[in-house]
Amino acid sequence: MALSYEFSIGSVRAKEKNLFTNSDIEHMLGCENVNELCRYLSDKGYGEGDDIEDILTSHSENVWEYLKRTAPDFAIFKPFFYLNDLHNLKAVLKGTLSNRPYSQLLVKPCTFSEETLKQAVENRKFSLLGEELSASCDKAYEILAHTGDARLSDAVLDRAFMELVLKTSEKSDSEFMSEYFKATVFYNNVKTAIRGAKADCDRDFLEIAICDVQDFPRSRVIKASVKGLEPTLDVLSKISAYGCNKAVEEYKVSPSAFEKFVDNRLMSLAKEKCKRSGDGADPITGYLIASETEKKVIHIIASGIRTKTNYETVKERLREVYG
């Protein structure tokens, strides 16, 4: 029997009750070592394993299996898959050309299997990845194989996949998905412009790396980025879309404060659109984003425990959660 969104939303709303609460986060912050954190997560039924990475992997697998069983149309998650495909293709490309193992670096779920990526790279047959990616992937291969410029090779792939993510999300029936990935690509451009300015990247690099997306003044930002960090931040501080001006203020505090602002901005969008929605795919997508954010929270807490960072500092770094 075909699944309905009415059923899916009811199921997701029940699942949301198991998402982290402030009490859960406080308990994790109080753990004295990573083993204690692992025990807490295992006892809560979050995932299985002897260490944090195993538990997170187990949890991710369970979330995706649940979404497969629950979502009427699993293809709605394609933009998220493409982000994993981007990571995987970079790993396979660099691993193949440097003759290093890469299998352990690959993440799921994804659109392209490890075997497909392997065949595409080893045989330089990027048509296996589809018409929309073929030319850019071949260009990235050419750059890395003949110049060793991993940064430029990555930039070519980033641009191609960001454009594909935009196109795919805009074709969906979800206004939220379109808006969420516009914001994702927007801030990917912001990060690229800042990194480019700090690394003294030339205009040619930035023209390749930064893509067109609504509300992002591409030409103006590229022109500023070539001049350096201060001119770049000045131009970005005058952009109000997606709270960019506020993000720049956070960057001036610290890069980590900026990253937190961006993550929280995306989470606020999900909470505003998905938690209030009573139909369509948005509530299911919101649950996925919530689960991914929880993984970031666990990583931050585990890192704080390992480095013996004080409670207030770790808490300040935590992302806003969905629950």
Indicate where each model-derived feature is located:
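N-terminal domain-start signal
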Residues: 1-323
